[in-house]
Amino acid sequence: KHAEHRMLMGSLLTFKRLKQNEEYLHGLSEMLIDRFIDKGSCDIVPEFAHATTVYAISDLMGIPMEDRAILLEQIGAPPSQVQGDAPLKVGPDPLVAMKPLFDAYLHDRLANPRGDLMSELVHARFKDGTSPDFDTLSNLARFLFGAGQDTTSRLIAMGVLVLGERPDLQERLRAEPDRIPDFIEETLRYDGPVKVAYRLATRDTAIGDLAIAAGTILTVCYAAAS
């Protein structure tokens, strides 16, 4: 199912659609900066980085403006915590809390398509021509909204930190704005938001001369590769 769902989602996020979102992003950045510029300071993560990611995907998906602040608060809540008592308990999952709202959006798009990502999602088809059931649509819509939120906001925040510590880079990028994509790429490589990933070996294997037994938990350090 993962491959089917990935193919379905990939068909929605086309280069043309993302390009059309650029003008909105420019206006969004100015709007967010206007909110704190007169103060002379801000908490860059919630006030700019996190807000940028939430509002950007909200615009692509066609989420009403009046609901975006609610979703920003929900997705920005502290991560779920595992309690130390038994039986095992975890904190609230923001994607679960969002389900009623997203279900309402999807029902509306089924009846009234609007040309946004959610409208395309509810009318999307798998490769064999079948349609996702409603629960699958709900899960995919919330996944689309939440995917990349944390990593993107961290990348934005790290980029701001680097520029704050390197006035020379600020001046260079102002003089050579065509180098901004290179700066973003290098920030992602040098101090990316995802440091490690974990994998479970399902069978005996080897990496080079290192034997790895089935059941071994592996830690993949992306920073080491950079």
Language model regions located:
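Cytochrome P450
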Residues: 1-226
